[in-house]
Regions:
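Catalytic core segments in nucleotide and nucleic-acid processing enzymes
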Residues: 1-143
Length: 143
């Protein structure tokens, strides 16, 4: 399910962010592979994004510490800064975002090409956010 969720998120990101290198998937270097680099042309800052098929993230405030460490670690790698054309000494740490499934969301995907959404801040972390997306559901024909 995790891989399927990753691909679903990728399809949603690519539907919104169509520019070259706005969304990079499974960026890999030196045996480290992150899910996505998100650098929308019209947003102020890029994100290191990880898709986690963990619906429980919608029910409680935080995220699993291992997941937070994983995404935070990717966001501190020098080659990630290079990939995003950032000067590691001149900018704030790269923002981190975890996307998880949440069937309580009103819409399936609320990202905008022109305006950076206000993601839910993960308490205890700096520049670390999470957002739930609603998954498609096949309606049963039987009552």
């Amino acid at each position: 399910m995790s891989k399927l969720f990753e691909l679903y998120v990728l399809s949603k990101l690519r539907a919104v962010f169509t520019g070259r290198k706005e969304v990079q998937y499974h960026v890999k270097k030196r045996r480290q592979e992150l899910d996505y680099l998100l650098k929308p042309a019209e947003w102020a800052e890029p994100y290191v994004v990880d898709a986690k098929y963990k619906p429980r993230y919608g029910e409680r405030g935080g995220v699993n510490i291992d997941d937070a460490r994983e995404v935070s670690g990717y966001a501190r790698l020098s080659w990630v800064y290079s990939e995003l054309d950032l000067d590691a000494d001149a900018v704030a740490p790269i923002k981190c975002l975890i996307i998880y499934p949440d069937q309580k969301e009103e819409e399936r995907f609320t990202f905008s090409k022109t305006a950076e959404p206000q993601f839910e801040k993960v308490s205890g972390y700096v520049r670390f956010y999470k957002v739930g997306i609603k998954l498609p559901v096949i309606a049963s024909k039987n009552p």
